[in-house]
Amino acid sequence: MTRRIFGLETEYGITYAHPTDDVTLSADEVARQLFKKVVAWGRSSNVFLRNGSRLYLDVGSHPEYATAECDSVEQLIAHDRGGELILVDLIDDAQRRLAQEGYTGTIHLLKNNTDSAGNSYGCHENYLVRRQGDFTRLADILIPFLITRQVVVGAGKIMSTPQGPRYCFSQRADHMWEAVSSATTRSRPIINTRDEPHADAEFYRRLHVIVGDSNIAEPTTFLKVGATDMVLRLIEAGVPMRDLALDNAMRAIREISHDITGRATVTLSSGKTVTAWQLQEMYVEKVRTYVESLGPLSPTDEAVFELWERALRAVETQDHSLIDRDIDWAIKKRLLDRTQDRLGCALDDPRLARLDLAYHDISPATGLGHRLVSRSMMNRVVSDAEVERASQVAPETTRAHLRGRFVTAAQEQKKDYTVDWVHLKLNDQAQRTVLCKDPFAHVDDRVDQLIDSMRTQAT
């Protein structure tokens, strides 16, 4: 597909730090406080917003934000970051109310993937693919890529092991149990095969990737989604690809993550052994050859290739300075290394654990991301203005535009309505419903008429 629909679903960790409070608040209680403002206007903790996104409380009191449908990687990043702005606003509102009730602690919303109890929550990537074609072939080619891409797009994690603490590439790697499955929590596959296209099922299916880490640095998300998109283009074009299947995928994903030198070797089904960066090089070379054969590269493709190849060079040479402003695991490692040197402490020191968490804290007041950007220690892909707009306005080039307009009009006219990814429904006497099955369609006369009817009734 030369044009693709993308989406990110991010589950957030939530905690309440209370150094002086006598009464603590559980994650459930904090989550309820966080969503009070949402429930007040939406009458539910599961709502679609004016910017086309979905915001809800997931299992385990994890706030989850699902971006609207986006048709470029840059647009997706803006809307992912826009979700952070929305959640920070909810944090501030809940914080004020708790302060009025005498609570002096701080709510922390963490864009990470594991908690102190060993539970994992995810960042799920969604890629629209055409129904035609062999999905088994797609998965077979994609799985080795997804397992090894952690060396260039992992979020980094301090992990306790029987051999002592170690710094790993990925937060999600140790929580994966299958390559492909229709489950999401019980067995946690790399690719979820549950067939929910949120589009015309005759033509499309939704590739649901749940192996990835949640990223703080925008360039890491840019590479994660951009490189995956280009590998999908290669597969969809039917370009022959040598068999890179791993002999033991679940062992490989863990062994790769645990060796921050990038030199851990994994065994292919053919019996050959390779490192993760060598396997990634095979993909990037094949993809570059294919994409360049189609004509001049787009600025986005150029930027993806540049960062992808630079990140692999950093892993191969161990020169992390090549990427320690762009790639999460390298940025965080630089911070941890400097702090460890300054304090003269071990990697399992609680102060380093707090630093690790602060890296993933999305609040400008308590998190590190905003400070790193302001000090030129973390690069950007999109502007503050683009993020601010994305927090309020749906993408104008996809179906999300229709949903955003409908939700905005219904709220302004105080109409009762129901929405999901495909349906727009007015809960009036006529129960009028519009089915929007084409995720690329941003213009629809039926939606225009539905919106006009609301405004006509109001006059």
UniProtKB/Swiss-Prot annotation:
**Pfam families (alphabetical):** Pup_ligase (PF03136)
GO terms in the biological process aspect are:
modification-dependent protein catabolic process; proteasomal protein catabolic process; protein pupylation
Single GO molecular-function term? magnesium ion binding
- Tell me the enzyme class: ligase
Record's keyword annotation contains Aminoacyl-tRNA synthetase: no
Binding of Mg(2+) occurs at 9, 56, 64
Specify which residues bind ATP according to the UniProt entry for this protein.
Answer: 54, 67, 421
Q: Which residues form the active site?
A: 58
Q: List the pathway annotation.
A: Protein degradation; proteasomal Pup-dependent pathway; Protein modification; protein pupylation
Task: Indicate whether Isomerase appears among the record's keywords.
Answer: no
Record-listed E.C. numbers: 6.3.1.19
Q: Give the function comment from the record.
A: Catalyzes the covalent attachment of the prokaryotic ubiquitin-like protein modifier Pup to the proteasomal substrate proteins, thereby targeting them for proteasomal degradation. This tagging system is termed pupylation. The ligation reaction involves the side-chain carboxylate of the C-terminal glutamate of Pup and the side-chain amino group of a substrate lysine.
What NCBIfam families does the entry give? pupylate_PafA (TIGR03686)
Additional record remark: The reaction mechanism probably proceeds via the activation of Pup by phosphorylation of its C-terminal glutamate, which is then subject to nucleophilic attack by the substrate lysine, resulting in an isopeptide bond and the release of phosphate as a good leaving group.
Family as reported in the entry's similarity comment = Belongs to the Pup ligase/Pup deamidase family. Pup-conjugating enzyme subfamily.
User: Which HAMAP family does this entry report, sorted A to Z?
Assistant: Pup_ligase (MF_02111)
Name of the protein in question: Pup--protein ligase
